[in-house]
UniProtKB/Swiss-Prot annotation:
Signal peptide residue numbers: none
Keyword Ribonucleoprotein appears in the UniProt entry: yes
Name the record gives this protein: Large ribosomal subunit protein bL17
Keyword Transport: no
InterPro entries: Ribosomal_bL17, Ribosomal_bL17_sf
Subunit structure: Part of the 50S ribosomal subunit. Contacts protein L32.
GO cellular component: large ribosomal subunit
Family as reported in the entry's similarity comment: Belongs to the bacterial ribosomal protein bL17 family.
Gene: rplQ
Example GO biological process: translation
Keyword terms, alphabetized: Ribonucleoprotein, Ribosomal protein
Highest taxon in the source lineage: Bacteria
HAMAP family noted in UniProt: Ribosomal_bL17
Region (Disordered): 153-172
Length: 172
């Protein structure tokens, strides 16, 4: 029986499951929104919010320059950075191909953005079934993520009504 065993297994062993969640978390932090299955999104939300909470609990210490911090605050910040870094990789690649320091993004950008917010940093939007295997898909994003920059919608030109075809007469 699996009483009091939280979390999903995803049909994987522990190391594969952990690697999958590490990569999903790194991609969510790098791109600020990703599309994945419902179950993975729900599990990813637990992991990502815990990492962001570690940074936000530092307050201003998380995004203040190192030189301005007291030795005690430097130690607190270093400890939090190492806790976050023990779970996610240091570097990620953004859509434009630039390298992103993921830990710095959590400690500086996200902690400043969510300062004073008691959790609930992500939103899961259901997208419907995936074509092919009918898996339920979701979009997981940070709640104040910038909107998706779509191409401006162009008004469709009205199509001229086609003349009705005249029935061909058969000679006979």
């Amino acid at each position: 029986m699996r009483h009091k065993k939280a979390g999903r297994q995803f049909g994987r062993d522990t190391s594969s499951r952990r690697a999958m969640l590490r990569n999903l978390t790194a991609n969510l932090i790098t791109h600020e929104r990703i599309e994945t299955t419902d179950a993975k999104a729900k599990e990813l939300r637990r992991v990502a919010e815990r990492l962001i909470t570690k940074a936000t609990r530092l307050g201003k210490v998380a995004y203040t320059a190192h030189g301005e911090l007291s030795p005690g605050d430097r130690a607190r910040r270093l400890h939090a950075e190492r806790l976050v870094g023990s779970y996610i990789p240091r570097w990620g690649v953004a859509t434009d191909g630039k390298k992103v320091d993921i830990i710095a993004k959590v400690m500086i950008d996200l902690s400043k953005r969510f300062e004073g917010r008691p959790g609930g940093y992500t939103r899961i939007i259901k997208l419907g079934p995936r074509r092919g295997d009918c898996a339920q898909m979701s979009l997981i994003e940070f709640i104040d993520a910038p909107p998706v920059a779509d191409a401006p919608a162009q008004a469709a030109e009205p199509v001229a009504a086609a003349e009705p075809a005249t029935p061909a007469t058969t000679a006979g």
